Regions:
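Glycine-rich loop(s) and the adjacent beta-strand/alpha-helix scaffold that form part
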Residues: 1-44
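C-terminal, flexible cofactor-proximal segment of oxidoreductases
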Residues: 21, 32-139
Length: 139
């Protein structure tokens, strides 16, 4: 996962399996990191372009507000929701991914908190992401 690079946050090792993915591109509690992961069954670059657009909007917002750090956080009302494997086995289940699923971030059973693999729903949802919304904390 992430090229076997050992990440830490303020000296504490990061275990991505302890995080929840936001839109399949950011991880709870991990500052200034966006994971660019495309579609399994469609053009990879369709999703990459949408993620890049969101990142540009975040960077512009950070520049305008003088912030240097952004972190995604689960809203309090979602904190008790079941955390599911990153990919639903019924949607995509190659052996190479299933073998390392325990290393992957988790997802919730909510579109904003997973990588849905559905371009037709994500294209509208990504365009509507409120980068100043409750999921984002800027410092």
């Amino acid at each position: 996962v992430l090229g076997d690079i050992a990440f830490d946050i303020d000296g504490a090792p990061l275990d991505l399996a302890d995080t929840v993915t936001y839109q399949g591109m950011m991880f709870t509690g991990v500052p200034n990191l966006v994971w660019v992961f495309g579609y399994f069954r469609a053009s990879w670059t369709l999703r990459v372009e949408m993620i890049a657009e969101v990142v540009c909007r975040m960077l512009h917002h950070m520049d305008e507000t003088g912030r240097r750090k952004v972190v995604v956080e689960l809203p309090p009302e979602l904190a008790g929701e079941p955390q599911l494997p990153w990919v639903d086995r019924e949607n995509f289940n190659p052996g190479y991914l299933m073998r390392d699923m325990h290393l992957m971030p988790k997802r919730l059973d909510r579109e904003d908190w997973q990588h849905t693999q559905d371009y037709w729903s994500e294209k509208d949802r990504f365009a509507a992401i409120d980068i100043a919304g409750r999921a984002f904390r800027y410092e």
